[in-house]
């Protein structure tokens, strides 16, 4: 079996399995995550250079706990077990486990008990801070293994069988709390597995362009829904390099986009990339649907269904359309498969809200192997400008869910102007690139104020600025008071109809990032 520079990660359900993949890719090595029901034969067909067994919430000693296909240990490639993965190795190879009544969660000081290529370059005469999250523990290592690390409360924190190149750690080297974790992973990849670091956005870009140009027939046409966000924009530019004007981008102006967004994005892409781009002005059509609607779920459905109708109508104007391109990312693929579920790739139209089956289009998902941070790197590789590369996430329903209550042209105008000030001030103060997301929300109430000698009764703007890694959790950002003061002052003075600005200091959970 000819080995490729690829690492297969077998997922046993850990919340940080994706972080293992990202750490490996950051080292310049391609990695894939597969559910723990993947067989050794399936992994062998992928020709990996190494295998990683992830952590997981189950107990190896439990009745229905995820099992190890021992054939994975016969592939002739190095294996690294992390947390649950270490316990699986010990249990299946003749070691002994003990069940703990309480979980060990948090930092621990790792002491190096024996030499190991995993510790290469580390100060083994000193302890190393690592992060633990486990219940069961290895009581006795299997035959052929050596205890290579311990902590004050854990006799076997790491073990190794150098002859079979099987290594295991009870802690999580992939999390940033483990201070030498990245070095340990690099040692596994380069010292133990001898992998060549050849994964880059440049090589990815070349491969995708080649694959798409071969996949799409000479007369086939491809449609792509452009939203102005980074994912769909990268898809469009990448496919344009592969098939040129056979790619048809459709940008639906739904009336709830940011200030000047349609002109800025479409103008730039046409000028610099010569995209075959159609902008559909459907603002009036969407706004009629919003009349009298206050419920956020109804607003979301209006956006989704109306978009589908408009996109379908425009697509049918293009002859010989065979493919739909969309910006599915790797986390979308992973999350669609339970770590216990079938090993299948998704082929759903989730990014565009479920396009009608009558379209009968094949999917092209050029970003389905990438994490969000890799998409940004690819955008830079493709020459996209900072205002697209570093644009904050924007919800599919747009400003419709940032106008709390009924969506009207007047209320949208107020919100757009206020939000533009927020973006400008975050950028001017150097905070825009430091935070995950920052935006304005128009509240469904008015308050009393004083301007000059007159009393006012006008709208309230809420400011929401959060920091996050993946949007699953988020914390409100402690912006400097002078930045908050400038934002508030400018909105009240420059946006007609607003006399109060409040700052949202809620974290997720329990609150969500968006208000609706």
UniProtKB/Swiss-Prot annotation:
It holds the Pfam family GMP_synt_C. It catalyses: XMP + L-glutamine + ATP + H2O = GMP + L-glutamate + AMP + diphosphate + 2 H(+). ATP binds at residues 227-233. One of its GO terms (cellular component) is cytosol. It is an enzyme of class 6 (ligase). Residues 6-198 form the Glutamine amidotransferase type-1 domain. The active site is at residues 83, 172, 174. The keyword Ligase applies. Keywords: ATP-binding, Glutamine amidotransferase, GMP biosynthesis, Ligase, Nucleotide-binding, Purine biosynthesis. Residues 199-391 form the GMPS ATP-PPase domain. PROSITE patterns: GATASE_TYPE_1, GMPS_ATP_PPASE. HAMAP family: GMP_synthase. NCBIfam families: guaA_Cterm (TIGR00884), guaA_Nterm (TIGR00888), PRK00074.1 (NF000848). Homodimer. This is GMP synthase [glutamine-hydrolyzing].
